[in-house]
Swiss-Prot record:
Keywords: ATP synthesis, Cell membrane, CF(0), Hydrogen ion transport, Ion transport, Lipid-binding, Membrane, Transmembrane, Transmembrane helix, Transport. CDD domains: ATP-synt_Fo_c_ATPE. It is found in: Cell membrane. F(1)F(0) ATP synthase produces ATP from ADP in the presence of a proton or sodium gradient. F-type ATPases consist of two structural domains, F(1) containing the extramembraneous catalytic core and F(0) containing the membrane proton channel, linked together by a central stalk and a peripheral stalk. During catalysis, ATP synthesis in the catalytic domain of F(1) is coupled via a rotary mechanism of the central stalk subunits to proton translocation. The record marks E54 as: Reversibly protonated during proton transport. Belongs to the ATPase C chain family. The chain crosses the membrane at residues 4-24, 47-67. This is ATP synthase subunit c. F-type ATPases have 2 components, F(1) - the catalytic core - and F(0) - the membrane proton channel. F(1) has five subunits: alpha(3), beta(3), gamma(1), delta(1), epsilon(1). F(0) has three main subunits: a(1), b(2) and c(10-14). The alpha and beta chains form an alternating ring which encloses part of the gamma chain. F(1) is attached to F(0) by a central stalk formed by the gamma and epsilon chains, while a peripheral stalk is formed by the delta and b chains. Gene3D superfamilies: F1F0 ATP synthase subunit C. GO terms for molecular function: lipid binding; proton-transporting ATP synthase activity, rotational mechanism. It is a multi-pass membrane protein.
Length: 70
């Protein structure tokens, strides 16, 4: 039962991170197209946002391992 729960948790985290990354990057590209002079600042903010979004699957993976070993 723990393996099923871990798989569902990882699926949700990966799906959410993929959608979130796609939205962040698409909005960053829209902003760069509108204001090219802010591309450096937008890129920096995008990397911070993507890093925070990617922390969700990593934390979910750790929790899934804890659930499976319980």
């Amino acid at each position: 039962m723990g393996a099923i729960a871990a798989g569902i948790a990882m699926f949700g985290a990966a799906l959410g991170a993929g959608i979130g990354n796609g939205l962040v990057i698409s909005k960053m590209l829209e902003g760069m197209a509108r204001q090219p002079e802010l591309s450096g600042q937008l890129r920096t903010n995008m990397f911070i946002g993507v890093g925070l979004i990617e922390s969700m699957p990593i934390i979910s993976f750790v929790v899934a391992l804890m659930v499976m070993n319980k």
